[in-house]
Amino acid sequence: MKFFALFIQRPVATTLLTLAITLSGIIGFSLLPVSPLPQVDYPVIMVSASMPGADPETMASSVATPLERALGRIAGVNEMTSTSSLGSTRIILQFDLNRDINGAARDVQAALNAAQSLLPSGMPSRPTYRKMNPSDAPIMIMTLTSDTFSQGQLYDYASTKLAQKIAQTEGVSDVTVGGSSLPAVRVELNPSALFNQGVSLDAVRQAISAANVRRPQGSVDAAETHWQVQANDEIKTAEGYRPLIVHYNNGSPVRLQDVANVIDSVQDVRNAGMSAGQPAVLLVISREPGANIIATVDRIRAELPALRASIPASIQLNIAQDRSPTIRASLDEVERSLVIAVALVILVVFIFLRSGRATLIPAVAVPVSLIGTFAAMYLCGFSLNNLSLMALTIATGFVVDDAIVVLENISRHLEAGVKPKVAALRGVREVGFTVLSMSISLVAVFIPLLLMAGLPGRLFREFAVTLSVAIGISLVISLTLTPMMCAWLLRSHPKGQQQRIRGFGKVLLAIQQGYGRSLNWALSHTRWVMVVLLSTIALNVWLYISIPKTFFPEQDTGRMMGFIQADQSISFQSMQQKLKDFMQIVGADPAVDSVTGFTGGSRTNSGSMFISLKPLSERQETAQQVITRLRGKLAKEPGANLFLSSVQDIRVGGRHSNAAYQFTLLADDLAALREWEPKVRAALAKLPQLADVNSDQQDKGAEMALTYDRETMARLGIDVSEANALLNNAFGQRQISTIYQPLNQYKVVMEVAPEYTQDVSSLDKMFVINSNGQSIPLSYFAKWQPANAPLAVNHQGLSAASTISFNLPDGGSLSEATAAVERAMTELGVPSTVRGAFAGTAQVFQETLKSQLWLIMAAIATVYIVLGILYESYVHPLTILSTLPSAGVGALLALELFDAPFSLIALIGIMLLIGIVKKNAIMMVDFALDAQRNGNISAREAIFQASLLRFRPIIMTTLAALFGALPLVLSSGDGAELRQPLGITIVGGLVVSQLLTLYTTPVIYLYFDRLRNRFSKQPLMKLE
């Protein structure tokens, strides 16, 4: 009593407290970073190792396996996958979410050091690692194009100047340059000329390496002068290498230009990027964890004039993809929904109270509660994102509830003629415990969510904390500011508004009287009401089992990724043309704004495309509909497939795949895996629940298999290492020397001329010079024939692995897809030696699916415990929780009606409903218990009076929550696919629960009262 009186009697202090909350919230809002979703930092580390020219099987056995054995001993590794391809190995280590990434990095470095002695000596550099976050897509992609500069020169400008400057921008963590490689001097050997001159390829390599060295020459101290000694020991251009003497033939010098074409080119000629139909170099920019995406993009754009000024005018630097516009638009839509929700909620209050002064009270309480939440968000390290702003939108209906309950009860006393201050004190005292119970039990719903492990727990932690803080601030405001404003603003018997109140009151009174008559019938026919309640429980079970489920709503971020997979034996030149053809098809679609792509590197039969769609206001189709439309056109391209998927803000797992979802086959026997993978893939491709089924198993690449005749080699004085060196020198793009420049280092690359690398008959022209100086053709001691060879070797853990990727067809659900895959595996009869498991997002979905019911039950149990403590009763919490089945039915029916799958967003909606719908029961039960304790009346009369007395605040709070969620249901534009499931779930649950709980709660109250009387004759205990 004294607590409430303190704030009513000290309006200045109460006002200043409110202003302090508001000011801190405004400051917090200005400091909050912006992102599409809460930051989930996956502790993922990628280890890279290279050995140019080595085939995938060699990389897997000699590089990947030793590294995997060392890295697999690190504590906290959840998953280890590796891909070994031509000349490179990439190992992805995914750690437990609770693992510190910096500590994990130290352990990785220690493991790499321990494995160094087990690695081949021919590796040009030690394995490296870098930290990465697979769920964080690039925030911007830039392209460099020019009509006058070569690809290598563009790459040099990009990596030497632009990448360095962009990386220094606040918020940027990494800038990756792609689409070409650094400039290099390429020595393109002519095998015929070498044979005629009697010069081996290895002799050329040694001569070049010896001619280009960078060593200190020292200094000379004369009597008066200190002289530095500097020699011309380096050759830095192709022109300088051409006259280099590599051999003497009968006393005549053989120069490099006599046996090779020496040109200024690039390190890797099998690497190409394209943008807008012309060759391009790509700059892929990523942000730091937790950085404000919009602010970071704005800083980069502000640097554009300086970046363009740092490169020649004939080089065009353009932005090909910008992640920020859709984020801006999505957050603008959420903020608009928030403002509309506040306005609708206040309108509900005005319609019921018909008083400008009374409406002013929640009009102040709601914004203060929401604004104050921003301060707590900043202190917790949260961001402004779709989920946190959705939490505030939903909170609008919650925070006004407390104010409505207090305001409505005080207004009831004022209408009875009680003086304002007395009415305020009496009114807040009567409902103080009710408001406290409502708020605490609502926050209790989120306790299991806060303790939830894994991705869902991390993802929705901000949502739960933001909503809980808003409710907590609302509780404080409703018990301090609201009664103070009522005492000083409202008047008893406002005669000027009497008629208006009576006019609307007639409608409300008629509804209330009709409710009273129907409630009286329900209390007389309790068995029928119980049948309805039990039916809703059964209907909940059936609807939950039958409704399609997915992990997260399919987002339309305005960005798509394309992955090209061509015939495994395709040449790089043909692959470039495929990339160009696919880019033309995609770019011609009316919904597409820009297309950027690249191909090459360690996999010559694959390529990637970054696709930006036009803003939603300029296109009619969703991203998924655009993909569906393009599938038919892309299928006409022979010899290659392009798999398109919409870029999502949530991506799980570090493995690369051509589609959104993965199913991995594991086997200890590689032969068994290669036998069953095509069968499984073919079976999955026939499933209508899946689309774009493809595999990363590529074991049909064209290989020229050489067989050495070791006896002949021994007789000719040739060992295997010399023969292998010949092949590496000829076809391995071997980096044989380094050119040092002030800003960068460049390589001298040697191989045979392109006309020889593109023709397998070139093997006939290869030769080795033995110890006797004789030129021995390769064909003398080796035979070769075409064969199949893997383009990549994949491991998971230490097992051979093959990942089958798939997308969902338009309108498909992940639950139907995973169930279909499991049925197909069972029907195929796959042996136990080949194990199948979902990976990435599909794996997390299955784990989440198993825990959903437990999470809901934990939330219900937590609320029961809290209510039991508050009411000092085992029974009354059950009465209150009896409202939940009807809410569940309404939510699931609404999802079915809107053809929306049950996702994590819908699950959060169900959790919210657990907190929302019980408020009606709390208001009924509180007043019924008070009437029984103090009025000495029967349970039936008490609950009947309580239901009628609290009818107006029940309708008001329900409508407030409903109108708070309605903008989410009706939302459109960017991010609507995230907001709508939450709004649909809440609105559907509220509508059905409102219709049913007005009858089921009183009936359950009577049943439990009879049960209490049967086992205990003690009167109800008064709670002070």
Curated annotation (Swiss-Prot):
One MF annotation (Gene Ontology) recorded for this entry: xenobiotic transmembrane transporter activity
A family per Pfam: ACR_tran
Organism domain of life: Bacteria
Subcellular location: Cell inner membrane
Keyword Transmembrane helix on entry: yes
Cellular component terms per the entry's GO annotation: plasma membrane
Segments passing through the bilayer: 12-32, 333-353, 360-380, 387-407, 435-455, 469-489, 528-548, 853-873, 875-895, 897-917, 953-973, 984-1004
InterPro entries listed in its UniProt record: AcrB_DN_DC_subdom, Acrflvin-R, Multidrug-R_MdtC
First-listed, main subcellular location of the protein, grouped into a coarse class: membrane
Record's keyword annotation contains Thylakoid: no
Record's keyword terms, sorted: Cell inner membrane, Cell membrane, Membrane, Transmembrane, Transmembrane helix, Transport
Gene3D superfamilies: Multidrug efflux transporter AcrB pore domain (3.30.70.1440), Multidrug efflux transporter AcrB pore domain like (3.30.70.1320), Multidrug efflux transporter AcrB TolC docking domain, DN and DC subdomains (3.30.2090.10), Multidrug efflux transporter AcrB transmembrane domain (1.20.1640.10)
Membrane topology classification: Multi-pass membrane protein
Similarity comment: Belongs to the resistance-nodulation-cell division (RND) (TC 2.A.6) family. MdtC subfamily.
Quaternary state and interactors: Part of a tripartite efflux system composed of MdtA, MdtB and MdtC. MdtC forms a heteromultimer with MdtB.
The protein, known as: Multidrug resistance protein MdtC
